[in-house]
């Protein structure tokens, strides 16, 4: 049983690459043809690459590894949050804060601050503080939650990164590479595939395409987790 069908990929517009003038020659091996000034991605290769990425995600999750989903462009934000949450994993879907991986201790301090303010809100501290101070704390909480909410329960570095558009997320990719954290990525015709360990050649600009592929990666994690439940049961 294949993980994904050509029909699903076609319907989601996964085959549409970027304009021919905006391409990375290293993506040539994944390009099928050119049509009306746009590169068309070879979906037979995408099917194979999705299957490889699926197996990789499943294996990492089966070993108890955590995967960090990263996608801050508008077309990816919702899918990244929804699918990472569904799979019980972590995500960054707003802005990648420099040092999220390479300076994780500092990020953990910000996360501690986020949790401290949350606790104050829950335990009634807000009720006894001056109104002005509460307004400031709520603003701070909102900002911290926006940028760190998806990783606030991440205790250590992830075992892998799943990235939508490595060109847009180049800081995240560079940090992961520096720390030898494997990267699985949705890579369009304008990206450098050499930066990514497990390339999924696909349209990274269509919401449906991003949602479809991200959901398959979440499915892989859930399959591994269901396997664990069966074993423990």
Swiss-Prot record:
Domain of life per record: Bacteria
Pfam families per the UniProt record, alphabetical: Ribosomal_S2
Keyword presence, Isomerase: no
UniProt-listed CDD domains: RPS2
Keywords: Ribonucleoprotein, Ribosomal protein
PROSITE patterns: RIBOSOMAL_S2_1 (PS00962), RIBOSOMAL_S2_2 (PS00963)
GO biological process, one term: translation
Example GO molecular function: structural constituent of ribosome
Keyword Transmembrane belongs to the record: no
Similarity-based family: Belongs to the universal ribosomal protein uS2 family.
HAMAP family, sorted: Ribosomal_uS2_B
Protein name, per record: Small ribosomal subunit protein uS2
Species of provenance: Bacillus cereus (strain ATCC 14579 / DSM 31 / CCUG 7414 / JCM 2152 / NBRC 15305 / NCIMB 9373 / NCTC 2599 / NRRL B-3711)
Lineage, top ranks: Bacteria, Bacillati, Bacillota, Bacilli, Bacillales
The gene coding this protein: rpsB
């Amino acid at each position: 049983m294949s993980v994904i069908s050509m029909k699903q990929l076609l319907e989601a517009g996964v085959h549409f690459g970027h304009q021919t003038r905006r391409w990375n020659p290293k993506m040539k091996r994944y390009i099928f043809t050119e049509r009306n000034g746009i590169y068309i991605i070879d979906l037979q290769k995408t099917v194979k690459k999705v299957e490889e990425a699926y197996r990789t995600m499943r294996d990492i999750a089966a070993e108890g590894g955590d995967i960090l989903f990263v996608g801050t462009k508008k077309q990816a934000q919702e899918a990244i949050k929804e699918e990472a949450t569904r799979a019980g994993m972590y995500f960054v879907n707003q802005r990648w804060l420099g040092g999220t991986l390479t300076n994780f201790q500092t990020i953990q301090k910000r996360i501690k601050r986020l949790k401290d303010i949350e606790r104050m809100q829950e335990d009634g501290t807000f009720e006894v503080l001056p109104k002005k101070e509460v307004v400031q704390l709520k603003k701070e909480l909102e900002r911290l939650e926006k940028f760190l909410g998806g990783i606030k329960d991440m205790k250590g570095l992830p075992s892998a990164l799943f990235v939508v558009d490595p060109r847009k997320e180049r800081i995240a990719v560079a940090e992961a590479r520096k720390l030898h954290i494997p990267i699985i990525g949705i890579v369009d015709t304008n990206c450098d595939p050499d930066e990514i360990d497990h390339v999924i050649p696909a349209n990274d600009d269509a919401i449906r395409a991003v949602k479809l592929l991200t959901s398959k990666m979440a499915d892989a994690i859930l399959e591994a987790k269901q396997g664990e439940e069966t074993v423990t049961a």
